Amino acid sequence: MSKLILIRHAKSDWSGNVNDLQRGLNKRGYNSCRVISKELKKRINKPDLFLISPALRAKLTYENIFLNWDDKDNNLFVEEDLYNASLEQIEKKLASKVLGFSTVVIIGHNPILNLLMYELTTNGHNKLPTNLVT
């Protein structure tokens, strides 16, 4: 693996009475996905492995950033433990899944993405806001 891209899900919709896993995106979330998609297309080829939280907002973030790219052949894995994983679980998942892939995307949640970013780099952001790509 030469690139690891961490994406916190886009801004979620808090209207309605739905459980946390079923919350979708709000208007701001959809808009930021369009911006992120355009910017990523300028900088990288389409990633060849996606590890995504089972939360609806994470799945919608993936769909709205990557599904309009030209290449439709994805290695997409919805990983149940990305919803409430520990740093150790994420590191084990990366070690077991990423061999043979050049660019891997994880779409998930804080605080774990923030912890992983700090574990892998010393120049990370202080806080990972929604839909930040690092």
Identify the role of each PLM range.
Residues 2-81, 85, 113, 132:
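Active-site-proximal alpha-helix that buttresses catalytic centers in soluble enzyme cores
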Residues 23-24, 67-69, 95, 121-125:
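Glycine-rich, phosphate-binding/catalytic loops in enzymes
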Residues 43-46, 96-102:
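Glycine-rich phosphate-binding loop signature in dinucleotide/nucleotide-binding domains
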Residues 62-63, 87-91, 116-119:
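Short, conserved acidic/polar surface loops in the N-terminal third of protein domains
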Residues 81-99:
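Short phosphate-binding loop-to-helix
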Residues 101-120:
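A glycine-rich beta-strand to alpha-helix segment
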Residues 124-134:
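Domain-level recognition of soluble alpha/beta enzyme cores
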